[in-house]
Structure formats: structure tokens, C-alpha cells
Amino acid sequence: MTSKRQYPIDQSNQLSQGQNPSPQQPLQQYPQQPYQPNPTYGNDTTQQWNQTPQQQQQPQQQNISPPQSQNQNGVQNTIHTGGSKRVYPVDPQNETLLSSNFSNMNLSSQQQQPLPQPTHIPVPGPNTTTYNPYIQQPQQQPQQQPQQQPQQPQQPQQQPQQQTQQPQTWNTSPPQTQQQPIQTFTPHISPPQTQQQQPQQTTPFQPMQPTQPSYSQPQQTQPLPLPPMQPSYNQQPYTQQPYTQQPYTQQPGQQSQYQQPQQQTPQQQAAVEQPVPTLENLCPKPFMRLSMNAIPNHPSILNKVHIPLGLNIHPLAHDPQGPVPVVYSSIIRCRRCRTYINPFVTWLNGGGRWRCNMCENINDTPQDYFSPIDFTTGKRSDILNRPELQKGCVEFLASSDYLVRPPQPPTYFFIVDVCYESIVSGMLNTAINAIKTTLGDLIEKSNGRARFGIMTFDDSLHFYNLKSNPSNRPQMFVVTDMDQVYVPPFEDFLVNLKDGLEVVENTLNIIQSMPRTQQKVESCLGSALKAAFSICERVGGKLIVLQSYIPRGPLGKLSIRDYQPLLGTKKESTLLQPSNDGEFYKELALSCTSQQLSVDLFLFSNDYTDTASLGTLCQITGGSMYYYPSFVASRDGQVFAANLIHSLTRDTAWEAVMRVRTSRGLTINSYHGNYFLKTSDLLGLPTIDSDKTITLQMGISDSIGQKYASLQSALLYTHSCGERRVRVFTISIPVVSNYQDLFRYADISVVTSLISKMAIDKALSSSLNDARDAIANKCVEILQAFKAASTSNPQANPAVTLSQNAPKLLLPETLKHLPLYVVSMVKSIIFSSRTTHPDLRAFHMQRMKTLDLNSCLNFFYPYFYSLLAPPNYQPPTTPNTPFVPHSFKLSSDELQRNGLFAIVNGYTLYLFIGEQLPQPVFTDIFGVPDVSQLDINTFQDLPILDNDHSRYARKVIELVRNSYPEYLKMFVVKSTDRQRRPEFQSLLIEDRTPEGCSYYEFIIQLQSRITQN
């Protein structure tokens, strides 16, 4: 029997300088218990999503029940919102800048780098007002700070040998600097200006008042000049403070210039002691974003504002500024909490010691890391050579202390269904062609280290020996006993892809051309997964499963649930949870996680597949699930091939674990994403790719006495090139004592994403109807809190109204589109009351758990474009000329009978053909003379034709598809199409639909609820 190895876990709380790692945490067993939305499999429970920790239960409010339309005769039979057009309210850049084109939802101290992403900017946004929490405001009467109770220091995990000194009180205001404009749309976060030092007094936080329109250039603080690097700083003992005295020097022929030693002034101490968040040292927003870019200093303030506090982490996001800098020097960490060195630590004793910004423990600086501090700048002399002290996003090259075994090469093992349905639908042929296309990229990305293996199955298992032989043809083994699967040694079925490329290509050709006369419909997926696990358990990697039937073998057999009577009832949520038969896949997923194996599922079926049960494999192992119902290669082959290629070639972290650390007072309540919770704060991620995010739901457990709060995430992983690295993100944000200020710093992108993930948990634990009510109630609670804040201090909380035709509903500037997203969310396929196949709804629920912010917002509020060029359109003169088509509001008011429109939600692209579209225009775009000759069942993309209409339509489609990681499936919707037209109409969420009221009616109900309360 093969012995199981213990695989690398995060050593972040176990390794200290000069010490060996502690023994590995034993594998957490999966207990028998009711389903929980997050795969914690322990005693951790998810709190009620619409309540924060230590929050008193609010009286149940009257739920918003959107009136159902009684008679729908088409798109035109709707209640409209007026003739005004709404600019498309989505943050297209996956980033909320201070001068946002969408809304002021990004008043953050954690700002990102200034370069925008052109492929994600399809629409400019409305004017907004910008605020900056780090710029000192006009003189106002400071608010009385409540007396804070002294906090007990956190108990260290390892007792230091010497007693640490107590932190001192410092003035936190840096020197006043000049502000100059910059020529970018990304703001700079300016530090507060220096104020007169007063003993035992600090300046309270002053919220900023709007001073300029949104399209004015943001101001940037001029950086102070840095001194030249000291050539001999490594020779000075770190216990000395050479900058506190001026040594005696006398030039020949001159009089003595000796001066008395000078003590550090309070201003010098402040410059050294208080690091200030700036644009350069904060983690860029594509990697890490908070729902509120300011932290309340007490739990009661968070409870009063009702905005959920959460953190969105995108570990492998694309950064327009370039790759993340890699640090090859030794890793410096806090002795107590194991925080990594970052730009927000405080340097003491001239650089000889440093205070942790998380736990405030004072640590000694290693001699090989010491550098003196220049008190004129408050920075180390070697700051330019230390990326970890300049940027909030760096990677450390991990030492041998972070290794339990040598880094394993990337391993790809394919499990392909070759049943009758896979052959006749064209899935097998499409998959083999796509795999052939990726072989060269897999070799290049792994520096020739990638391993490859493949097996096929129907009612038996087929293994292929890929070892090199004189004929370069594989040897095939067939196993028919599905109860006790015998697997030969794994070395025969996993080969180095570069060395065995010819054998691999021949194997794929043989599988593709193998004659299959019997129509086998049995699928032994469970046995195939067991065999693949036995082959790959020693090396880890990724299992890619292509499945056409619901599993019917002796292992992992899933029964077809009778779902029709449950649709539309409270018990519908049971169809979205794993069945009792799915326990096999949960246990298998836990075994895969312990051996660093992830599972990617590609599901093709004409009937019920039970994606809720099979999706557990992806959810626990950090994999992905793709769902193609009623797959036909002539219609869906292009989408499937593109997504398979993307899933294999995207950036991937292997053998990963992640931990998030917070400063005192902040707590992490739950996680959302595909992961396995090894301990209370350690996430196991066999793989995590560039498309996935992890969302944290947070709370405040105690008063926060510091001026800034810090958060740091650390991802320990194996790079595809073979290096073991630690990717560290760090942010520091201001702490406020007035809940009215929090509305200024809300980020609607993170707030919307967090509400949707919490609502999914609510739907799984209760019902879809309760989830819809909870979404609407959360919106009411936030707007009620804002109304109370505006009533008490109107000047500090500027409000906006939607339009002149809409009801006078006051909304915070940063959350002015929250009601629109709430309506979109309730009408989406995830929460809609419309009859929906449970496989499709469960698939989208799991997909939403890992979506990035841009894809999440656009899924709820899609893009709406016209594919006909406007009259004043001028073609771009150069290929690099920006192209931004106009997006309409999602209402039937924008539809025209002689038009051609596209609606895209990041997953599907709908083309709506008006019934009076001119015949010459139709021919120029589709290449056929009449709409009746267009086969919508096999249509995949627009043909490439040499005319202006075709070029413009294809340019819009290309722009939209490049904005998403997945390839979009395209559907053609004719005006007479009874199947696709209801799907298209359901995306016009601002109109009244069978799923609920119009946006205008929802605003009226919101105003009524807020006024009554």
C-alpha cells in the first residue's frame, strides 16, 4: 500500500528566525453534519449574513415584495422609467479610483497603480465627487474623541528571550509637503500636513469635504528626496544610533567645528515613527479591496452603518503596472504574529528595531538587514533597494524552511468520457484538438517541467502507458472491475511532457480515431476518479474531468432527483445542495486536498447532471466547473475549446496555502470561494488560478485605538517555474470614530459582491425567497442609516438623487447605484423566482463564489450595446486608438425595430435582431440574404466580411469578449423566437418582468419603507 506523504502547509505561524518548523497539522477529518455553504468541515459556523458580530438583532422589517406582472405581451408592455438614458453603472476596470468614471465608491487609502485597463473600459461614467482620507481638510471643530480603554497585548505564540519595551506615544503627522497635479486618472493618497506638536494630544481624524469635480486632475504629494545610500552601514552595530550625534571633524588649517550632540526632535521622531499610506506603498486594488476604505473604531459604529465589512482578494490578478517584484533576500517576520515585513512597520532606535503594524510587538532588526534611518525623510537609507519596504505587493523567494518536500512540477491528468453521447455530440473530438493546441504552452510555462497523463472511461477504465518505446505508440490497459480498481505504478502513466511529446501526440490521435461500435451509455466516473487519484497522489497537480452523463457506476453513483415538483417552493434550495449520494465526492475531494490535487470539471449532458453534488469536487479542491447543457460541437464547440485552452494556460499557483492577518480589533468571520479550511485561519488551495478570488466577511471585536488599521494576506505557493514563493499583500487604512464618515469610503463593487455571496449562503441554508428578502432588507438598512447620518450632519454626508423623473430618494454618493444592483441581483438567474433548471442555478451559484469584481457586477447588470454604428461614427485611424461604444440602460425604451443589439453578462452574449432591420445591413453583418436563412442552432460567431457594418459589429463583439477571462457563448434572438426571447427580456431589468417590479417601482417602495421607519 502506498504511504501517504504530508504535504506543505503554511509555516507562517510556526517558523521563527533560527528555528525549525513545528510538526504539520494533521489532516482535518470531514464530520457527518448538515450542509454548510462554506466547506469548513469543522466547528466554525457562518454567522447570519445580514448581521455583524456583536450586533443586536434588528426588528424584522417589512419585506419588499415586488408586484408580479399579470400580463406580459412582450418587451413593449412595460412600465418605463422615463425618457432619460442612464449611463452604464458598472465599474469596468475592476478597480474603483478616487476620480471614478462610475461613482465615488473608491475613497480608499489603499489605491492602486495609475494605469487603466483599456479592454475593461467600455463606457465612461457620470460625474462624481472625490474624497481623500489622507488630505488635511479645512479647519473644522474637532469632534470629541471617546476615552479609549487600554488594550491588553496579544499573547505571543513564541516567548522572546528578552522583555519587550512598551510602545511610546508619537505624533503621527508627517512634514507638510507640496501638492502637484499628475496626468493620470489614478489618485495619489496624500499624508496629513504637519501640525504643531502638543504634549499628550493628537489631532482627531477629519473627514474630507468635496473640493473639486470628478474630472479634475487629482493632486499628488511631492516625494521627499532620499539621501544617498551609506556605503558602510552594514559595519555599524545596530544597537548604536550614529545619527543622534555629530562626530568631531577638523580639516587641516581650519578651526575646530565640533558641535554638541543634538537630540531627536519630536518632528524627527514623528517622521520615523508613523508610516503614512501612500499610492506607492499600498497594495494595488486589483489584488486587494475593502468594502469600506476606512475602519470604524468600535463594533457599535459598524452595526449602526449596516454596510457589510469585507475584503476581496485576487491573488493572481493581472497588474497593468507589470509583474509583482520578487525579493530574493532573507524573509523578515514578526516574532509574535508572524507578519511579514512591509512598508507600514515602524522603525525604532535608528533602524535597530521595528514595531509590527499588526500586533505592535517590537522586534530586533537582523544585522544583515540593518540600515540607518534618515530623520529628514523618515526612511531607511537603502529604501530604493528594498521593494518589500516600498510596495504593498511583493513576492518573497521562500527558503528551505518553507518546504516539506521539493517543489513538484505542474501535473495535468485528463479523465475523458468516451461514452456514446461524447462521440456523437463532438465533445471528444473537440477536446482532443484543444489539448493538442496547449501542449507547447504547457511546456513553455513550466520551463519543460510539466507532466502529462490521460485516461478514458465508459463502463470500463482505459489507461495509456506513455513511456517512450521504439514505436512511440502507447500501451493500453483496460480495467473492467469497477469495485476494486487495480492501478499499475504511476510512473507508467505520468511522463515529462517535453521528453515524451511525440508519444503524447500519438496517444491523442489514437484516442480521437479509435473506432467505437458499441453505444455505451454507462459512466463510471467515481471509479475513474479513484484510479486517477491513485496515480497522482504522490505528486499532486490537476485532474481535468470531461463528463457527459450523470455518474452511474458502482462508485459515486448519483440518482436523478425528482426536481420538477420542488421548483418554486421553499424546498427548491435542497436541489442546490449536495445530495446524500454525493458524500463519495466530498470524501474524495478531501483526500485530493490532502495530496495537493485539484479537480476541474467540464460537464456535458442532455439531462439532469446534479452539478450541486459534483461541484463539491471543485469547491473543496480549489478547481473550476464548466457547464454546457445539451452540448453540440457545431454550436458550442468553439466556446468549449476556448475555455479548455484558457483553463490550462492561465497563470496558476500550485501547492498553495493562504492566511490573512489583521491588526488588533479586526476579526474574520467567514470565507467565500473554492478552498478547504485547514485551520481557523489557514486556507488550503491545491491550486488557485488568475480568475479566482477569495472574499472575507469581517467584523470588529473590540475598540481600535490606532490611527491606522492594517491587513495582510500571504499566499505560500509553488510557481510553475519550480520556485517556492510567498506572495504578500498589505494595506493600511484610516480608523474613524464617526459612522457618518463611513459612507464616504464605501466601495460599491466590493459591497455588491459581498452581499451576493452572503445571499447565496442564505439561499442554501434557508430558501430562495428568504435570500431575495434579505437582499432588499440590507439595501433598506443601509439607506436608513444614511438618512440618519444625513439628518444629523448634512454637510458631512453629501447625498444625490437618481434623476429628475425618479422619486426623491437620497443616496450616498459612493452607493448611489446600490438599488439598481439590488434589483438586478433579485432578478438574476441565481435568485430569480422564474422557473430555472437546478443544474444551471447551482452552477451559477458556485461560479459567483469565485468571480472577480468586474465580472460579478457585469453579471448582475449586463452591457447593452447597439451593433450598428452611430451616424457620427469615425473609424479609428490607428489600431491603438481607444474604442468605447455607448452602453444603454437595460430597458425596452432603447430597443428599435430596425436595430441590432447585444446584451452580455460575462457568461452569455445575446444578439437581438429587430424585425425591421434593413436587408442590406443584415447581409453585410451575417453574410446571408435573409434572417430565415440564418441557422440559430449552429451559429457561433459573426463572419468576417469586408464592409463597414461588419467591421463595426465585430469590433464591439471583440471588445466585449476581451473584457472577460472566459469565452462568451453567443445566442441569436429573433423577434419571433419564443425560446430565447424570454431570456433576453429577463435581462432588461429596469422594466417590469415576470420576475418582479421595474426599477422605478422599486425606488418608490424603497422610499416608502425608509419614510415609514
From Swiss-Prot:
Sample GO molecular function, one term: SNARE binding
Bias-annotated ranges (Pro residues): 115-125
Ranges of Low complexity composition bias in the record: 11-39, 47-73, 97-114, 136-223, 231-269
Bilayer topology: Peripheral membrane protein
Location of this chain's protein in the cell: Cytoplasmic vesicle, COPII-coated vesicle membrane; Endoplasmic reticulum membrane; Golgi apparatus membrane
Region (Disordered): 1-273
Annotated binding of Zn(2+), by residue: C334, C337, C356, C359
Gene3D superfamilies given in the database record: beta-sandwich domain of Sec23/24 (2.60.40.1670), Sec23/Sec24 helical domain (1.20.120.730), Severin (3.40.20.10), von Willebrand factor, type A domain (3.40.50.410), Zn-finger domain of Sec23/24 (2.30.30.380)
One Gene Ontology CC term in the entry: Golgi membrane
UniProt feature, compositional bias: Polar residues: 126-135
Pfam families in alphabetical order: Sec23_BS, Sec23_helical, Sec23_trunk, zf-Sec23_Sec24
Biological process, per Gene Ontology: COPII-coated vesicle cargo loading; intracellular protein transport
Keywords, ordered alphabetically: Cytoplasmic vesicle, Endoplasmic reticulum, ER-Golgi transport, Golgi apparatus, Membrane, Metal-binding, Protein transport, Transport, Zinc
Chief place of localization: membrane
Residue ranges, annotated region (Zinc finger-like): 334-359
Reported function: Component of the coat protein complex II (COPII) which promotes the formation of transport vesicles from the endoplasmic reticulum (ER). The coat has two main functions, the physical deformation of the endoplasmic reticulum membrane into vesicles and the selection of cargo molecules.
Protein family membership: Belongs to the SEC23/SEC24 family. SEC24 subfamily.
Subunit description: The COPII coat is composed of at least 5 proteins: the sec23/24 complex, the sec13/31 complex, and the protein sar1A or sar1B.
Entry protein name: Protein transport protein SEC24
Source organism of this protein record: Dictyostelium discoideum (Social amoeba)
Phylogenetic classification of the source organism: Eukaryota, Amoebozoa, Evosea, Eumycetozoa, Dictyostelia
